[in-house]
């Protein structure tokens, strides 16, 4: 690897996306893995599906061994222009009213504990009052 390191855009790397010409972007570096497709333990489809994008997460999620990481050096062809890689947008949930669900249900339980006995007492007095008037 003498001389200057070649810098590729993601568009350039994306053109190398088939079994006869397969390039990957992993950790800011570009690798030509065409010769490795047949030897890859996970099959060539795994590598081909990672073309045209930053495949760093795909590579890291598998948990490659240190020997697999060392193997990357022999397929290195240059670096990626990081400005050409789309930034990942972090998911932010929509704003919702702030209320505590636990406190709301706790309030309802206390309210029912107070109201149910009052309603029962009111019904009992109503029945007694009604039956007293009808017998008189």
From Swiss-Prot:
Keyword Transport tagged: yes
Q: Report the membrane topology from the UniProt record.
A: Single-pass membrane protein
What does the entry list under GO cellular component?
endoplasmic reticulum membrane; intracellular membrane-bounded organelle; membrane
Compartment(s) of residence: Endoplasmic reticulum membrane; Microsome membrane
Q: Name one GO molecular function term.
A: metal ion binding
Q: Which residues form the Cytochrome b5 heme-binding domain?
A: 5-81
Give the transmembrane ranges: 107-127
Which keywords label this protein? Electron transport, Endoplasmic reticulum, Heme, Iron, Membrane, Metal-binding, Microsome, Transmembrane, Transmembrane helix, Transport
State the InterPro entries in the record.
Cyt_B5-like_heme/steroid-bd (IPR001199), Cyt_B5-like_heme/steroid_sf (IPR036400), Cyt_B5_heme-BS (IPR018506), Cytochrome_b5 (IPR050668)
Question: Which Pfam families does this UniProt record tie to the protein?
Answer: Cyt-b5 (PF00173)
Instruction: Write out the tissue specificity statement of the associated record.
Output: Is highly expressed in developing seeds, moderately expressed in flowers, and is expressed at low levels in the leaf.
**What does the entry list as the binding residues for heme?**
40, 64
Q: Which family does it belong to?
A: Belongs to the cytochrome b5 family.
UniProt-listed PANTHER family: CYTOCHROME B5, CYTOCHROME B5 ISOFORM B
Task: Relate the protein's function as given in its record.
Answer: Cytochrome b5 is a membrane bound hemoprotein which function as an electron carrier for several membrane bound oxygenases. May play a key role in the modification by desaturation of fatty acids in the endoplasmic reticulum, which in the developing seed is utilized for membrane synthesis and in the developmentally regulated production of large amounts of storage lipids.
Q: What is this protein called?
A: Cytochrome b5
Q: Species name for this entry? A: Nicotiana tabacum
